[in-house]
Swiss-Prot record:
Subcellular location: Cytoplasm
Gene Ontology cellular component list: cytoplasm
CDD domains to which the protein is assigned, alphabetical: GroEL
4Fe-4S as UniProt keyword: no
Function per UniProt: Together with its co-chaperonin GroES, plays an essential role in assisting protein folding. The GroEL-GroES system forms a nano-cage that allows encapsulation of the non-native substrate proteins and provides a physical environment optimized to promote and accelerate protein folding.
Lineage start: Bacteria, Pseudomonadati, Myxococcota, Myxococcia, Myxococcales
Keyword terms, alphabetized: ATP-binding, Chaperone, Cytoplasm, Isomerase, Nucleotide-binding
Organism of derivation: Myxococcus xanthus (strain DK1622)
Quaternary assembly: Forms a cylinder of 14 subunits composed of two heptameric rings stacked back-to-back. Interacts with the co-chaperonin GroES.
Binding-site residues for ATP, renumbered to this chain: 29-32, 50, 86-90, 414, 477-479, 493
Protein name according to UniProt: Chaperonin GroEL 2
EC identifiers of the protein: 5.6.1.7
Organism domain of life: Bacteria
InterPro entries with a match to the protein in the record: Chaperonin_Cpn60_CS, Cpn60/GroEL, Cpn60/GroEL/TCP-1, GroEL-like_apical_dom_sf, GROEL-like_equatorial_sf, TCP-1-like_intermed_sf
Keyword presence, Plastid: no
Length: 549
């Protein structure tokens, strides 16, 4: 298959055209006065969004060379979204500015490798300055402010996220679900919850709510199936003598064993409830060990040399309260030792650091939350499906931004933090053409502020100069159109988001600047189909004989 190849200036011009098309579509969404973008869907209603990465992901260009440029900037937005969860539009604006300025210098004959080194030095200096500028998030109010800004000024979302974080802690899991009604609400589940319900409705103790409630209960955690009553009998007799309720968690409980438990429950001999173990395969084993650690019991597993018919009450876990409905089991206030729980938490944290799979990381994070905090669910309500999709995306963005703020602190928002970091570029030791790379960054970091102001219908240059002349957190609040102390006004960005956006934008733009050739497949030429031939003549329809009337 023959390929098309572009060299030198023509290659960079094609990249720039692609970068501009994508960035111009994305950057209209930046800031409190940013506009919406409507995206056609192959089925259902179109999506209306103000989320940069959602817009970027939808863009594919017809020209293959321009499309390569667009895809590289899309990578900037996606990577920023993956790492920091927000800041995708800022990253796109920065990438466009860095590449546009750099392409002019390379076209004028400057060495792109010198420029790249200058860009790297400048970004390193600004990132170090951002870290100095960042202040830790102290209270719920600041977390709510970060959430509000990331949710495009929606205070209810900011407040709900701050409430959720306060209730489940930094390590807690916060999930976003679609609500049935119009209201956006917060549900918090304390303790350890997993998605398995009772194996028989006969275990229910509260018929009105259809749930089994066990107070001050014992917990039997078994890795394998239980089908024979013979194995269970010894421990059941001990539990009956102790007069305490019992929860049995096993891979499955069936046949004779389940029937006997149900009969004993109905007769009032034993207050018992049986549920299947959560998860599958190795993850199931790990989750059962988590439950054992949390409740101070042992997991009954044959590979550990523990048999079901030899265990005593000492091997069972304990919890103050257990609630089981048809879908979920919640264990509150387990009797596990604090040291053992902390050791388990440390182990899970180490696994989170090591894993490269996003799915595994998410599941490990959930296990961690169940051990240390709890789980909060934000139910997003809206009037229509289109509004629901848009609002849910905003809540997820805001949630990611608040997590980033808790992690690395906050800096003044509205593009001001970058301008306050410019002083870090003055003392850099530079050689040769590196100065041009630093100048590119010096100009590029003004771009987010210019764009925020431009989207608000004002002149960017005037505002940039006024902000440069001042110091500290003083800047332009685009939501109100006033100059003020942005930290006091609650216009703040997570330092992690600002840092990641600049690093990713500079990384990809530098690569594009040092591109000397581009190779793409030639578009296939559609051959004109020959005109369709007429239908062959239909043979004569033999004489039909005289049709007498």
């Amino acid at each position: 298959m023959a390929k098309d190849i572009l060299f030198d200036v023509r290659a960079r011009e094609a990249i720039l055209r692609g970068v501009n098309i994508l960035a111009d579509a994305v950057k209209v969404t930046l800031g409190p006065k940013g506009r919406n973008v409507v995206i056609e869907k192959s089925f259902g209603s179109p999506t209306i969004t103000k989320d940069g990465v959602t817009v970027a992901k939808e863009i594919e260009l017809e020209n293959k060379f321009e499309n390569m440029g667009a895809q590289m900037v899309k990578e900037v937005a996606s990577k920023t979204s993956d790492v920091a969860g927000d800041g995708t539009t800022t990253a796109t604006v920065l990438a466009q500015a860095i590449f546009r300025e750099g392409a002019k210098l390379v076209a004028a004959g400057h060495n792109p490798m010198d420029i790249k080194r200058g860009i790297d030095k400048a970004v390193g200096a600004i990132v170090a300055e951002l870290k100095k500028l960042a202040k830790p998030t102290k209270d719920k109010k600041e977390i709510a402010q970060v959430g509000t800004i990331s949710a495009n000024g929606d205070e209810t979302i900011g407040t709900i996220i701050a409430d959720a974080m306060e209730k489940v802690g930094k390590e807690g899991v916060i999930t976003v679900e679609e609500a049935k009604g119009l209201e956006t609400t917060l549900d918090v589940v304390e303790g350890m919850q997993f998605d398995r319900g009772y194996l028989s409705p006969y275990f229910v103790t509260d018929p009105e709510r259809m749930e089994a409630a066990l107070n001050d209960a014992l917990i039997l955690i078994n890795e394998k199936k239980i089908s024979s009553m013979k194995d269970l009998l010894p421990i059941l007799e001990q539990v009956a003598r102790a007069g305490k309720p019992l929860l049995i968690i096993a891979e499955d409980i069936e046949g004779e064993a389940l029937a006997t438990l149900v009969v004993n429950k109905i007769r009032g001999v034993l207050n018992v409830c049986a549920v299947k173990a959560p998860g599958f395969g190795d993850r199931r084993k790990a989750m059962l060990e988590d439950i054992a650690t949390l409740t101070g019991g042992r997991m009954i597993a044959e590979d550990l040399g523990i048999k079901l018919d030899t265990i005593t009450l000492q091997d069972l876990g304990r919890a103050k309260r257990i609630t089981v409905d048809k879908d979920n089991t919640t264990i509150v206030d387990g009797a596990g030792g604090q040291q053992e729980i902390e050791a388990r938490v440390k182990q899970i944290r180490a696994q989170i650091e090591e894993t490269s799979s996003d799915y595994d990381r998410e599941k490990l994070q959930e296990r961690l939350a169940k051990l240390v905090g709890g789980v909060a669910v934000i139910n997003v309500g809206a009037a229509t499906e289109t509004e629901m999709k848009e609002k849910k995306a905003r809540v997820e963005d805001a949630l990611n931004a608040t997590r980033a703020a808790v992690e690395e602190g906050v800096v003044p928002g509205g593009g001001v933090a970058y301008i306050r970091c410019l002083k870090a570029l003055d003392g850099l030791q530079l050689s040769g053409g590196e100065k041009f790379g630093v100048d590119i960054i010096r100009r590029a970091v003004e771009e987010p502020l210019r764009q925020i102001v431009g989207n608000g219908g004002l002149e960017g240059s005037v505002v940039v100069n006024k902000v440069k002349e001042s110091s500290g957190p003083f800047g332009f609040n685009a939501a109100t159109g006033t100059y003020e102390d942005l930290l006091a006004a609650g216009v703040i960005d997570p330092a992690k988001v600002s840092r990641t956006a600049l690093q990713n934008a500079a990384s990809v733009s530098s690569l594009m600047l040092t591109t000397e050739a581009m190779v793409a497949e030639r578009p296939k030429e559609e051959k004109d189909l020959p005109a369709g031939g007429g239908m062959g003549g239909m043979g004569g329809m033999g004489g039909m004989g005289g049709m007498g009337m």
